[in-house]
Amino acid sequence: GACGLMQLMPATAKWFAENKVRIEYSEEMLFEPEYNIRLGCAYLDYLKGRFDGNMGSVLAAYNAGEGIVRQWLNSSLYSADGENLNAIPYPETENYVERVQDTYDMYVRLYREN
């Protein structure tokens, strides 16, 4: 399953570390907070670029995988325009996206008030 603070899947983390950010990788390193956060944040930034900053798609891809989100975006069942998800067929991913977006919105409101 997913490892460390950023809950990275080992296969995805290995591919990303070795092919995109070109840093050392071992599954044990995923349990080192500094390494895990560094790799997880870099992966989120990578997904942000791949999905043109569309945070719904970025978060869905972080949770379910980039390939499956691309399939959803190419399906009229889940996307009317190929850029935005109208529906997410995985309940876990749908809940994840909603929770993260709700938490983000809460922090935006909190920091605007202060």
Stretches with model-predicted labels:
Residues 57-114:
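Catalytic and substrate-binding regions of cell-wall glycan-acting enzymes that process beta-1,4-linked
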Residues 1-23, 35-43, 100:
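Substrate-binding/active-site groove segments that recognize
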Residues 17, 44-45, 62, 104:
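Generic helix-packing signal
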Residues 32, 52, 105-109:
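A general structural signal for short secondary-structure boundary/capping elements
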Residues 25-28, 50-61, 114:
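Surface-exposed patches in mature extracellular/periplasmic domains of secreted proteins
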Residues 2-3, 23-33, 47-49, 83-90:
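Second-shell loop/turn segments in exported
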Residues 30, 34-38, 56, 94:
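Non-membrane alpha-helical structural segments and their capping/turn regions in soluble enzymes
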